Structures are given as C-alpha cells and as structure tokens.
Amino acid sequence: LGLSVLFISSNIALAAAVCSNLGILYSGEIVESGSAKDILQNPQHCYTKAFLSCLPTPEKKGMVMTAVPGRMPDPLMKPEGCKFHPRCSQCEQICRETRPMLHTIGNSHAVACHIVAPLDGEKLRTGE
C-alpha cells in the first residue's frame, strides 16, 4: 500500500501485531530499529533487552515481575553519551562520554550502542 503510520505504544506485543517494523525509543531517541520479528527474537540494545525481559509471558506465570533498574533521566538534564548508560549493566567509559550513532547490523536491523558493533555482525566490547 505504500502507507506509513506512526504508532506510539509501550505495549510492544500490540505494536508488533500492528506494525511490520519497530523503532525502540529511550529518552526520546531511537536506540534500535528493525523488523518487529527481528527485534523481538534478537534484541541488541541493552534497553531493548531489559525492557523485553520485564514483560509478562506465560513462562513467567507466578513469578515476581521486575522493572528495568534505575530511573529515567530528567528530560532537562539528560546525561552525556548514551542516555541509557546510567541504567546499563554493560556500560563502558565510551558510553558515558560519547553519544552512539545508529549503526546497521543486519539487513534491516539498526542499533545505537557502543557495545554492539557493526563488524561482521559480531558483538565487540570496547576498551579491550
């Protein structure tokens, strides 16, 4: 149809049912984008992984639900570098200092993360 619709929701199951492609936002910035199937089955950004791990699933029935650790940054005082770095379990010094750019890591998958590098699809740790 050649139709584009901006559908904003924190209900990722609904968004995936309605949309063929997703853009994951954190603190007003796209941190990951790609096909709904790819993002749900192979999330790359630490925020996407943390967000998806908090969602209720049949396998988690009866378990205590968790939240993404930490707090959202104040919109008027956002941190330098990656906006998710204060909450990220894989944060490195570069994450604190330099804002990551959106890099293509697959046919239609892109991520803004210093920990995930677009080098032959391999994950790299910075500072090693």
Language-model features: locations:
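Catalytic "switch" loops of ABC-type ATPases
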Residues: 10-11, 51
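Helical segment within the ABC ATPase nucleotide-binding domain
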Residues: 1-2, 13
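Charged, flexible cofactor/metal-binding loops and thiol motifs
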Residues: 35-128
